[in-house]
Each structure stands twice: as structure tokens, then as C-alpha cells.
UniProtKB/Swiss-Prot annotation:
Gene Ontology molecular function terms on file: histidinol-phosphate transaminase activity; pyridoxal phosphate binding
GO biological process, one term: L-histidine biosynthetic process
Primary gene name: hisC
Organism listed in the record: Methylobacterium sp. (strain 4-46)
Subunit structure comment from the entry: Homodimer.
Modified residues (N6-(pyridoxal phosphate)lysine): K223
Protein name: Histidinol-phosphate aminotransferase
EC number assigned by the record: 2.6.1.9
Catalytic function, reaction form: L-histidinol phosphate + 2-oxoglutarate = 3-(imidazol-4-yl)-2-oxopropyl phosphate + L-glutamate
Pathway note: Amino-acid biosynthesis; L-histidine biosynthesis; L-histidine from 5-phospho-alpha-D-ribose 1-diphosphate: step 7/9
Length: 370
């Protein structure tokens, strides 16, 4: 009989660093501009809100466990087979389910140096070993990833574009990565920010999924679609991979309001176009303005920028964060990603963007080079 006085988690669980979301509060009496979680300033599609409200009179009913209406809507938009689509409570859930289905103790999962923190959490939760591939210029390095592959590798995770850096790999490089992987290694393309990318050499990965047995693409409704509160994600996968995930997925992991809102949002092309147009206007404006102030900004194709600060007393990211927070401007510290001297800023409303630019201009002026 065990001598423990209370239930004890299995070995390794308490060693996992819990994910800490971006801050969402400002000092009392100060107008809040939350730019810490890459949420769209345009909000959700009115059609999605209306569809969600229509479900409110039937909350006693279980949702459709297969999310068929949402899968059909997604399939229609992208020309996919609905049977190869799995929906989840955000793409985070799907990333975790993929890991639990294909990884266990003794296995390894590879992700790039500044990749999404959820990959590490999911790998450790599955009993696997995280393997970090170094990046080059804050961008995933295909050669470094391939060099990290061993007979124990089960999954390679690639956020493309990457969060928090905003960098991306051209599709030719993604193809080269896939070509270099053994057939029994699953390549997971996390395309959470794909809607925002306007580069001729970028592709989210649908074509590669269609022609491969070991590639999955995940997407989310939390960013460009403005439905973060409803937690809606989806993935498209080879039939065998989708089947494995469905076997361990919760039976009602997506509620009726989320299913209805997601299906309506997919059909509202004009709303997505407006969100992308806003980002196309403000991403270069913010980048240029911050650079003119004297700050270094990693070139981004997402709806956010990574701003670098000097490693110097009084002038660093922590001090800048405190300065901004006192003015109601909430950015994201990214020290947990190994970037202690940087802040990530969501491209927000015109008012919010201008406020951050003005505040950082004042911060840099008040904290000049020594």
C-alpha cells in the first residue's frame, strides 16, 4: 500500500511549466488597450454573433459531437473532404490530441527554438522528450530540424508563421523539410496566422497534406476570425491520422454556439478581408514607426510584431513593459520563449497602435543610451 497521503501526479507532470496567457488588465482608471494575445481589433463577424445567439434557446441539448456543419463549411471553403477534418476546442486541443495519439515515453518531438510553448507542454504531458532545433535570424532552420531527427522522433511541429517571432518559411522550404523526414514521422504544420500572410512564396500546407500520409495542418478561429472566446480550431489530416485523433477526442469537445458561429464566420469572406486589410495597413506602419524610434523589430507576416530592447539597466523589455502597462498598454512579455529582451505587440486598432508608438517614443527619449 502506498504511503502517500494524497494522490500524486505521475512522474514529470509537476515539472511542466504551465502556460501563462498574456496579461489583460490595466491599472484602475486607465483606458485599457490589450495587445498581448494577438486578437483582431475588428472583432467577430456579425453573422457569427447572430448564429451563436440563435443557439441560446436550446442550451439544454448536447451539440453535434462531430461538428458536421462546421466541417462542411470548412470543406466547402477550401475544397476538402469533410471526413479528413477534425474540429477542436482551439487548435491547442488538436495539437495536444495529435501528440497524445502519436507519442509516448521514450519518443521525441522536435520544434524550433522560438516555437509555440504548447508543443513542449504537450510533448511532456505525453511522456515524450522535447527536442529544440536552433533557429537562424529568429526563423525556423530546416537543416537544424532535420539534424535533430533520430529514430525516436515521432512528431515535428512547425508554426508557420511562427509565434512570437512573426517569421515564416517559404513553401519550398516546408517541402524540403517534409522530403527529409522519415515516413513514420508526423509533420504538424501549425498555420494559426495563415490568413494574414500575403507572400507569394507562402502556403499554409493544404497541398502537402493532400498528397502525403504524414502531414497535418492545424488552423484556428481565434485570430483573424475573432472568435477566441469560443475556442474553435480545426485540422485536416490523412484519414488514418484523423481516425486516431477522433478515437481519443472528447465526444462533445465543441459546443453548439461555437459550431454555429464558426460555420457562419467561414462564409463571411468580407469580414476576413477587412481584418486582413487592416493588418496590411498597420503592420508596416507600426514596424516603420518603431524602427524610426530606434528599436529593432523582427520582420513579421502575422498580426503582431516582436520588438527588441537593449539589455541595459532601465532600458530593457521589463522596464518598457512596466512603462506601457502604467499607461494601459498591455503587450506580451516573451521571456518564457527565451526572448527576455523583447515584447510582442498585437497590431490593434488605430488608436491603440498610435498610443503604443507614442508611449515607446517617450520611453526611449526618457531612457537614452548611457
Amino acid at each position: 500500500m502506498s504511503a502517500a497521503l494524497r494522490p500524486v501526479p505521475r512522474p514529470g507532470v509537476l515539472a511542466i511549466e504551465a502556460y501563462v496567457p498574456g496579461k489583460s488588465a490595466a491599472p484602475a482608471g486607465v483606458k485599457l488597450h490589450k495587445l498581448s494575445s494577438n486578437e483582431t481589433p475588428l472583432g467577430p463577424s456579425p453573422a457569427a454573433v447572430a448564429a451563436m445567439r440563435e443557439t441560446a434557446s436550446h442550451l439544454e441539448l448536447y451539440p453535434d459531437g462531430s461538428a458536421a456543419a462546421l466541417r462542411r463549411a470548412i470543406a466547402g471553403k477550401y475544397g476538402l473532404d469533410p471526413a479528413r477534418i477534425v474540429c477542436g476546442a482551439g487548435s491547442d486541443e488538436l495539437l495536444s490530441l495529435l501528440t497524445y495519439a502519436f507519442m509516448g515515453p521514450g519518443d521525441e518531438g522536435i520544434y524550433s527554438e522560438y516555437g509555440f510553448l504548447v508543443y513542449r507542454i504537450a510533448i511532456l504531458a505525453a511522456g515524450g522528450t522535447p527536442v529544440v532545433a536552433p533557429e537562424r535570424d529568429h526563423t525556423a532552420d530546416v537543416d537544424a530540424i532535420l539534424a535533430a531527427v533520430t529514430p525516436r522522433t515521432r512528431i515535428v511541429y512547425l508554426a508557420n508563421p511562427n509565434n512570437p517571432t512573426g517569421t515564416y518559411l517559404p513553401f519550398d522550404e516546408v517541402r524540403r523539410l517534409h522530403a527529409g523526414l522519415p515516413g513514420d514521422v508526423l509533420l504538424v504544420l501549425d498555420a494559426a496566422y495563415a490568413e494574414y500572410v500575403r507572400r507569394n512564396d507562402y502556403a499554409a500546407g493544404l497541398e502537402l497534406v493532400a498528397e502525403s500520409e504524414n502531414v497535418v495542418m492545424t488552423r484556428t478561429f481565434s485570430k483573424a476570425y475573432g472568435l477566441a472566446a469560443l475556442r474553435i480550431g480545426w485540422m485536416v489530416a490523412p484519414p488514418a491520422v484523423a481516425d486516431a485523433v477522433n478515437r481519443i477526442r472528447g465526444p462533445f469537445n465543441l459546443g453548439s454556439p461555437a459550431i454555429a458561429a464558426g460555420a457562419a464566420a467561414v462564409a463571411d469572406d468580407a469580414h476576413i478581408a477587412a481584418a486582413v486589410a487592416h493588418n496590411e495597413e498597420w503592420l508596416p506602419k507600426v514596424t516603420r514607426a518603431l524602427t524610426e524610434i530606434g528599436l529593432s523589430v523582427t520582420p513579421s507576416v502575422g498580426n503582431f510584431v516582436l520588438i527588441h530592447f537593449p539589455d541595459a539597466p532601465g532600458r530593457g523589455a521589463a522596464e518598457a513593459d512596466a512603462f506601457l502597462t502604467a499607461r494601459g498598454l498591455i503587450l506580451r512579455r516573451v521571456a518564457a520563449y527565451g526572448l527576455p529582451h523583447a515584447l510582442r505587440m498585437t497590431i490593434g486598432s488605430a488608436e491603440a497602435n498610435e498610443a503604443v508608438i507614442a508611449a515607446l517614443r517617450a520611453f526611449v527619449k526618457d531612457h537614452p543610451d548611457a
